[in-house]
Amino acid sequence: MIAAVHGPAIGGGLGLALAADFRVTCAEARFSANFNRLGIHPGFGLSYMLPRLVGQQQASLLFYTGRRIAGEEAVRIGLADQLVPQPEVRSKAIELAEEIAASSPVAVQSTRSTLRAGLVEQFRLAVARESIEQNIHFETEDFQEGVRAMSERRMPRFKGY
């Protein structure tokens, strides 16, 4: 699966993009794991997928700060695979799919299975943990403040509970 990211991939949208095998993007795209800015634990399997792609240090930085990064930085840190002009994102993603399709389907499928061995189980464990943590966070004042602050387009004033 190939994701063509030409706009925002934020929160759950980032999780969807990371579920793909490859990501084609542009300078105008924005990526953010902004959960902590909302006062909540990351979800959508991001606590497993993001460190797997960019490393523990970069993932921690993106989670803790909620920082938005552009397409260039996403490619630089390994979050995306190709940087192309915005009007070409979709066509370049299709070109990549066609390039992969020129290989043996049996070989591609078995290689993908080998590369992803154990991924499903680890992903399920991460999602289960995320769900437990999020259910706790939904009840906090910090989560309510984070959502309120985002809707009011202001910095949140978290209390730590």
Language-model regions, residue ranges each:
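Short alpha-helical scaffolding segments that buttress acidic/His motifs in well-ordered protein cores
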Residues: 62-63, 111-114, 150
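CoA-thioester-processing core
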Residues: 4, 10-64, 77, 92-96
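Hydrophobic alpha-helical segments typical of transmembrane helices
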Residues: 46-49, 58, 70, 110, ...
